Amino acid sequence: MSQIKLIVGLANSGTKYEDTRHNAGEWLINEIARQFNVSLKEEAKFFGKVAKINAAGGEVRLLVPTTFMNLSGKAVGALANFYRIKPEEILVAHDELDLPPGVAKIKQGGGHGGHNGLKDIIASLGNSNNFYRVRIGIGHPGSKELVAGYVLGKPSPQDQEKINAAVDEAGRCVDLLLKDGITKATNRLNAFKA
């Protein structure tokens, strides 16, 4: 099992986006930063906000790209190259249309499912999709045409409550992952439903 060395939370930068569904990945990074009592700081050379936590297996970097979502790979690629972090040592948290609110799942590899942030990260890692993901369920609007507006919209209070519960549990599972490995964390998170 690879030791995770970089955890990325995908988001659009700027206050008008911070409460939108597409920023669910950043919500998880904020939760992990809170657990480890660190603050993310803007780092221009990594095109994002960065923090360092000390976990059982060594240093782990947290990253929220401050590029637009579809340029997330620029930040991930810059940081991964600088610290020589391999794709399988990266965990990317992102919003997931194919899971309902209140559910989050860990998986390795797979396509980008139309997610432009994931698409750009795969390209920036030399077309490797071998990184791990935490897929945070946001639900689906029902029709493809509605997706763009939906991901940039805010969840209903009921959905937000469920997403928050899944993000909290995902935060606990990331802590477990850093201590006990990916399998235990995956089994626990993938069984959770708010």
Swiss-Prot record:
Q: Where in the cell is it found?
A: Cytoplasm
Q: Which GO terms describe its molecular function?
A: peptidyl-tRNA hydrolase activity; tRNA binding
- Please state what class of enzyme this protein is: hydrolase
Keywords, in A-Z order = Cytoplasm, Hydrolase, RNA-binding, tRNA-binding
Q: Which GO terms describe its cellular component?
A: cytoplasm
> Is Translocase there in the keyword field?
no
Give GO terms for biological process.
protein quality control for misfolded or incompletely synthesized proteins; rescue of stalled ribosome
Reactions catalysed, semicolon-separated, are:
an N-acyl-L-alpha-aminoacyl-tRNA + H2O = an N-acyl-L-amino acid + a tRNA + H(+)
**Protein family per UniProt:** Belongs to the PTH family.
Descriptive protein name: Peptidyl-tRNA hydrolase
Gene name per UniProt: pth
